Amino acid sequence: MASSPGNTNPHNTPPFDLGILFKPSSNPYPPPAASYPPPTGPFLHNQYDQQHYAPPGISAQPSPVTQQQQDVSSSSAATNLHPQRTLSYPTPPLNLQSPRSNHNPGTHILALLNNTNNGAPVANQEPSHQLPVVNHNEIARSFPGGSGPIRVPSCKLPKGRRLIGEHAVYDVDVRLQGEIQPQLEVTPITKYGSDPQLVVGRQIAVNKVYICYGLKGGNIRVLNINTALRSLFRGHSQRVTDMAFFAEDVDMLASVSLDGKVFVWKISEGSEGEDQPQITGKIVLALQILGEEDTKHPRVCWHCHKQEILVVSIGKHVLRIDTTKVGRGEVFSAEAPLQCPLDKLIDGVQIVGKHDGEVTDLSMCQWMTTRLVSSSVDGTIKIWQDRKAQPLVVLRPHDGHPVSSATFVTSPERPDHIILITGGPLNREMKIWVSAGEEGWLLPADAESWRCTQTLDLKSSTEPRAEEAFFNQVIALSEAGLLLLANAKRNALYAVHLDYGSSPVGTRMDYLSEFTVTMPILSFIGTNDPPEEPIVKVYCVQTLAIQQYTLDLCLCLPPPIENMGLEKSDSSVSREANLVEGMSEPSGLKPTDLPSVDSVPKPSIIVNRSESANKLSFPSAEATSQAIVPPNGEPKTSGLPSQTSGAGSAYATLPQLPLSPRLSSKLSGYHTPVEAIEPVIPHHELGGKTPSADYSVDRQMDAVGERNLDVSSVEEISRSKDSNVTPDDDVSGMRSPSAFFKHPTHLVTPSEILMGVSSAEASITTEDRRDRDANIQDVNNDPRDTEVEVKEISEARSTQNGEINDHDETENCTSENREKVFCSQVSNLSTEMARDCYPSTEGTFIPGESKAYGQPIKAGDESGVDSRGGPAKLLKGKKQKAKNSQGPGLSSTSSNVANLADSFNEQSQSLSHPMTDLLPQLLAMQETMNQVMASQKEMQRQLSNAATGPIGKESKRLEVALGRMIEKSSKSNADALWARIQEETVKNEKALRDHAQQIVNATTNFMSKELNAMFEKTIKKELAAIGPALARSVVPVIEKTVSSAITESFQRGIGDKAVNQLDKSVNIKLEATVARQIQAQFQTSGKQALQEGLRSSVESSVIPSFEKACKAMFDQIDSAFQKGIAEHTNAAQQRFDSGHSQLAHTLKESITSASSVAQALSRELAETQRNLLALAAAGANSGGSNSLVTQLSGGPLGALLEKVEAPMDPTTELSRLISERKYEESFTSALQRSDVSIVSWLCSQVDLRGLLAMNPLPLSQGVLLSLLQQLACDISKDTSRKLAWMTDVVAAINPSDQMIAVHARPIFEQVYQILHHHRNAPGSDVSAIRLIMHVINSMLMGCK
């Protein structure tokens, strides 16, 4: 099936050919051909009966144990004999599966479906197929709700391959020596006739209660894991491409389909009257995105902490949907969802960004919830931030080829340990990306850069085209540290282990394990539920069924450090040391009398948490093999050379290998190979009660890990006389420690940001053994303790508990050698590793557990006395050895246990000794019990001394880490603040220079151009007005003077002389008079009129305009400068004060928390000592244990947990901030909670009107705008008070402020619409509403 390079899904998908998916691969170990459902015979035998395994050479012959059981009990032969399945590949080493408790949801739901679906028709959307039913004659064990399900365990141990270097290549067709690809343990859930299509996306979603998967027509099937109730959700009209639950404990399901429909379902159960409960799905959101026609795989992604926010990709667009705003007040319908075109988005839907090609995957960062990554077929991934139209980062991770997946992965140890994993075409090439900053830590910034640290390339050497060999689906399980890839073309599942390291840049893919499945996986999802078991449950949509595979985490981890030296230097294959345990064979033991092996406990898990180096370590998954006797009767063993002790037991020891300095600071662990060869007490002998498996927890302060030891009950010797007992009465099981990967969804607090360590976890597990047994209480220590090497002390348990390992047929007991290897490493120290190897004999006594039992031995137990030797004499010798070896350390207790176990092994080889010979043994047992108690007291004293050092060391480490972090944060904040101040100062200086230059240019232009023209125009106008006035004043005077002069001249003389002089006289007088009059008139009236005209013209036109222009210009410059400087100074001061006050407060809280934890640990340690002393004094009194359980349950640790888990009242913190006059911080904290009741309470605690009247304002414009919006959203409650507050707030808002310029208009419009809906309020409120609406309208007009 070819796939175009521009799309991860095939174009124009033809009818799917199942032959392609089931095409045999070139795997040298092909999976067995199996039809659905898988054969049940051999695997049910492995799961629920005592295991009888035939080696490869004699697989077709009945085993000796089977023959023996046929002779002993013919009634149980039909139960125990199952034909071994013939495999088409070499039989792997023995893999003994331990029986699990019924935590498997697939097991439970299948059993319930078998009862609820008998004879009931199935809806036409889901093909009707009968689920496999198990015959009750084959399984004598009862299950709740009906017959047991089919659970097919894995038949061989995996052997993976190490991934070394920055570019690792894994060829799926090449098998190195020793590599094994087993089939996974599978539990069918339901038969399913799917429409096989190879497309990306999650077609199945699982949480703690429900399993949801899509059907052909777009409907969604919902199954209750616990009750097997079923329901069908209808709404999608085409295939569902993606679905996801908000969280594992929240029943909110989001789904999206090809037709662009987005649904959010709130799943609930209820019943009407006495009817059977029904599953119902309330539609929280029904939306159809229009505008993208050719969409292949829409995706959906929840916000990490907000149930009302989800992100959806439709075609090339990435949308953010707020379910509280979309269709507010409307009732959604599945038949008619709300329409939302991309070119005209409705309220509550906004576009985050867009790609050039279709979006293939979405992922949101849990730590920094403003970061969202999207991948596309255009070859890019883009990292988006809230409220920014452009992406922060655009990467082309796979050289421009389509990107099929992009996922943020967060370390479970540190929430700020973030990496990005991308997948190329067909998810064949996987890359790890980290931030390019120091050590890869992701810090808030406006621009980012990422770099690739490692690449994993999957290739096929037999297929020339990658499309014919690969189509991988990818999921990342951050808590388990796994990256799972399901290859539908090869029926394979690849588990890639992630080693997080001490920093993001140190994260590596270091190990790859391959598993085979029976049919192609079309889509899958993984969970860590139940948290008690170190397993991952993978729920798969396959071509013929919905199935659940169980993946043991210990099978996906690289070998421990001890086995590093066994690897070849020229290959990447990891080789583990085989631990071989020999069996002591007394003279009376026949080769055909080998005891049957019921189960081998899976290796336990150590979780070591440290701030400097986060480690997740697992012991190696090593199967301890017995000596297998071939037909010729010669026992053979394989493995390392063994040394034979004096008793004839062979102990396999690990070679002392050099440790890798590079790995010494990252991995620490131990492994405990155990053979469980103990029969168990029949069910009817326990008084009708089902016994729960005993286990003990070894506390180790350096790794703070937990180890499970499967402690089975012992079958009494008289069992052979009871014909009603069958081997199927075995109901023992193994229980795992408390959850390792349980991380519920939570909101990140500032202290978590600074400290980077998770809160303390403690759990108390009690287990009721039998009516007369004492209760055992195991308390898990705080996983953050520092590493201190503490010796393990093995304690002996009294054999009066009826736990003597006898076999009623062989008359002997096989002693078992246990080797414990304890490796301890201190963080950041890679120079040395301490090993403590010691052998101990495991028989009746269980390390780490002490029980007192006062019930006398029954008469039927007399057969346990050895007739071939003097028991009193042997006991005396053992007693003397126990006295000589008694001491406060590890060797004394282990030797006591070994000697006592040897004595019982020797005594149990005879069945004819009288009862009276057991009395010395009882006395010796009592004395040994006292020695064990003394050793216990010494161990407690050593633990007390060892606990003080770790607490002090942890306090110092915490202090140093906090100091470094605070110093680094303060320095970065100060540098950023100083850089911002300098930048703003430079900007202001540049603006001032620009304004001054503009003023100079304007003044120059005015003086050179406009002033001359205006002055000339004014002069001309005034002269034109002065001329007529001057003529009117001068002409009458001239006329009068001329007439008077003429008259005078005529009067003086007549004649020639008079006439001659008349002309001269008239001219002289006329000139003098005219000149004098003109001068006088001009000096008096003309000059004054000219000056007044000029002055009035200049004053009326030139000077006012010039003064007005200059004043306006200078006022604008001054106001802008003063405002900018004031706002910048206030913002810088507030940011500086808030940053330092927050750091100081966080530091104070961190120190207080650390002190309280240290005090609680000290008190708990003292209480533990007192309780253990009380237990020793109580002896065989079972009532004392009950009181101890009561004391421990109500002890200081429980009170501390209740104190830690109690939620903090936000009003207390807000009151403190108000008392300190930190109004900005208090309002910001209240508004960020998105709780209007808290905001209203805060407004009522302060004088908001007086606060807003201060100068400068103590609240920033952003806080005021947010306060206005939140008060408006809850205006229906306490309307009058909120309107008064809104009136004061809206009067203080400056819409031209650059801080809120982008957000002011949409928020004003929203508030205006809310007030518009409340216009019909009472009369006293109408005026306030209109006033606020008028002010908002004015601001909106000013914002245009």
Curated annotation (Swiss-Prot):
SUPFAM superfamilies: WD40 repeat-like. This is Enhancer of mRNA-decapping protein 4. One of its GO terms (biological process) is post-embryonic development. The modification Phosphoserine is found at S98, S660, S692. Residues 925-946, 1147-1178 form a coiled coil. Residues 766-795 have a biased composition (Basic and acidic residues). As a component of the decapping complex, involved in the degradation of mRNAs. Essential for postembryonic development, especially during the formation of the shoot (SAM) and root apical meristems. Required for normal patterning of internal tissues of leaves. WD repeats lie at residues 235-275, 354-394, 397-443. Residues 27-41 have a biased composition (Pro residues). It comes from Arabidopsis thaliana. Residues 1-88, 616-649, 711-735, 762-815, 845-896 are annotated as: Disordered. Homodimer. Component of the decapping complex. Interacts with DCP2. Present in seedlings, roots, hypocotyls, cotyledons, leaves, stems, shoot apex, siliques and flowers. In leaves, particularly present in trichomes, some stomata and vascular tissues. Its main location: cytoplasm. SMART domains: WD40. Residues 1-11, 616-627, 884-896 have a biased composition (Polar residues). Disruption phenotype: Lethal phenotype at the seedling cotyledon stage that are small and chlorotic, with disorganized veins, swollen root hairs, and altered epidermal cell morphology as well as leaf and shoot apical meristem defects. Altered RNA decay. These phenotypes are suppressed at low temperature. Keywords: Coiled coil, Cytoplasm, mRNA processing, Phosphoprotein, Repeat, WD repeat. Induction: By auxin. GO terms for cellular component: P-body. Residues 1186-1230 form the LEM domain. The keyword Repeat applies. Belongs to the WD repeat EDC4 family. It is found in: Cytoplasm, P-body. The modification Phosphothreonine is found at T86.
